[in-house]
Design a protein with these regions (language model features):
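Terminal, non-globular segments
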Residues: 1-168
Length: 168
């Protein structure tokens, strides 16, 4: 139990540090920004209590907001991501699968399942984040393009992290 807690605390800290120190400084073609820190929400165990999931999601976003001076933008996007995560899991997984496997990993669930799961969560996060950031539907096509391209980059980075960190 303590080892798992330390492992997830490390994932929290490392994902925030990577986001704040590296990925926030990556802007491709003035529109594509990776949001790697969502990895923490993605990797939480299936049996994480809903209140804890929401608290951790909000804390993750708030921590990034503090470092990037974006009051509430990341916190609200992460809170929404944490809120919809249980529904997404129920939508794409059977009850037996969620009870027999402890956490979402490529090794546990398979590449196709994991990529679909990550894509769904990242798209929701990015849609909310970029439209809150724009705070208007003016320039809707440009914002939607940013959502799609940034989502692709974020999903690729998150899935690649599985092969780098959890290789056997």
């Amino acid at each position: 139990m303590v080892i798992n807690l330390l492992k997830y605390a490390l994932v929290f800290v490392v994902s925030v540090l990577l986001q704040v120190l590296i990925f926030n400084n990556v802007l491709i073609a003035r529109m594509i920004s990776p949001f790697f820190y969502i990895l923490f929400i993605v990797l939480l165990p299936f049996d994480t209590p809903r209140a804890m999931l929401l608290f951790l999601s909000f804390s993750l976003g708030l921590t990034v907001d503090i470092f990037t001076n974006t009051p509430g933008v990341n916190a609200s996007a992460c809170l929404l991501t944490g809120f919809i995560r249980p529904g997404v899991l129920q939508l794409i997984s059977s009850r037996e699968t969620l009870e027999s496997v402890t956490a979402p990993r490529v090794g546990n669930m398979g590449f196709q399942w994991f990529a679909g799961y990550v894509t769904f969560l990242v798209l929701i996060h990015h849609l909310f984040l970029f439209f809150i950031e724009a705070f208007t539907f003016q320039g809707f096509p440009f914002t939607l393009l940013r959502v799609i391209l940034s989502s692709v980059l974020s999903v690729v980075l998150i899935v690649l992290s599985q092969f780098i960190i959890f290789r056997k």
